[in-house]
């Protein structure tokens, strides 16, 4: 069997993207890094996004950290998801930065969250810390769009959280708010502050926040599609 090669340009169809992702299934991160001419770090402490970057290279992703999807021409977002030996997610999944100001007129249909989750290529990767990074294997990909029920619940969560932001209740939001979607601080250090709306409508400084999918959502999604018991 010939070895796979990284795509040198963005895939032109979903079929091409999925076929390339399927070729990576079963390879270790170390093998894929070596084939792409990259060095595998010892761990992810200083390279938290390394797995995502590696797979973006292999799949010809174009967006980088821009607000558009990773495969903008296809409207597809790439999400790697670390899983345990039973295929269950080990952590929540970052979706996008939460906008804390300038939210008048924003709706679920026009939100960054919905745009990012409209069509997702999920790639599970072994994530247990007992497995050295280079030895962790890539799993089978899943090209997914939310069904009606998932979209409804995500919308309800988003609307609840955005209402709290707009009404100046940002400091009251905890990770427990939302059934599937949560908002958490997203900052490497506590000095990286951003503007938000305070309880009396005044401008305040607070930690940047991000939208994350809770593990109960991604766990059910993977179980349904991969028939995990």
UniProtKB/Swiss-Prot annotation:
The keyword Nucleotidyltransferase does not apply. The keyword Membrane does not apply. This is DNA mismatch repair protein MutH. The lineage of its organism: Bacteria, Pseudomonadati, Pseudomonadota, Gammaproteobacteria, Enterobacterales. GO terms for molecular function: DNA binding; endonuclease activity. Keywords: Cytoplasm, DNA damage, DNA repair, Endonuclease, Hydrolase, Nuclease. HAMAP family: MutH. It comes from the Bacteria. GO terms for biological process: DNA modification; mismatch repair. GO terms for cellular component: cytoplasm. Sequence-specific endonuclease that cleaves unmethylated GATC sequences. It is involved in DNA mismatch repair. It holds the Pfam family MutH. Belongs to the MutH family. InterPro entries: DNA_mismatch_repair_MutH (IPR004230), DNA_rep_MutH/RE_typeII_Sau3AI (IPR011337), DNA_rep_MutH/T2_RE_sf (IPR037057), Restrct_endonuc-II-like (IPR011335). It comes from Escherichia coli O6:K15:H31 (strain 536 / UPEC). It is found in: Cytoplasm.
């Amino acid at each position: 069997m010939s070895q796979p090669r990284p795509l040198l340009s963005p895939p032109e169809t979903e079929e091409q993207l999925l076929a390339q992702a399927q070729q990576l299934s079963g390879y270790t991160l170390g093998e894929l890094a070596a084939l792409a001419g990259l060095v595998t770090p010892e761990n992810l402490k200083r390279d938290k996004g390394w797995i995502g970057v590696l797979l973006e290279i292999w799949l010809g992703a174009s967006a980088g950290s821009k607000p558009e999807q990773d495969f903008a021409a296809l409207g597809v977002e790439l999400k790697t998801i670390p899983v345990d030996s039973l295929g269950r997610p080990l952590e929540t999944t970052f979706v996008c930065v939460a906008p804390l100001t300038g939210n008048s007129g924003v709706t679920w249909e026009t939100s960054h969250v919905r745009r990012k989750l409209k069509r997702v290529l999920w790639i599970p990767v072994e994530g247990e810390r007992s497995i050295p990074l280079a030895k962790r294997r890539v799993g089978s990909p899943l090209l997914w769009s939310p069904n009606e029920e998932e979209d409804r619940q995500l919308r309800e969560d988003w609307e609840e959280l955005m209402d709290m932001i707009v009404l100046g209740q940002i400091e009251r939001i905890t990770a427990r708010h939302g059934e599937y979607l949560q908002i958490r601080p997203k900052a490497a250090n506590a000095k990286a502050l951003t503007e938000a709306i305070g309880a009396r409508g005044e401008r305040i400084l607070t930690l940047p926040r991000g939208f994350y999918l809770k593990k109960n959502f991604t766990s059910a999604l993977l179980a349904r599609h991969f028939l995990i018991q």
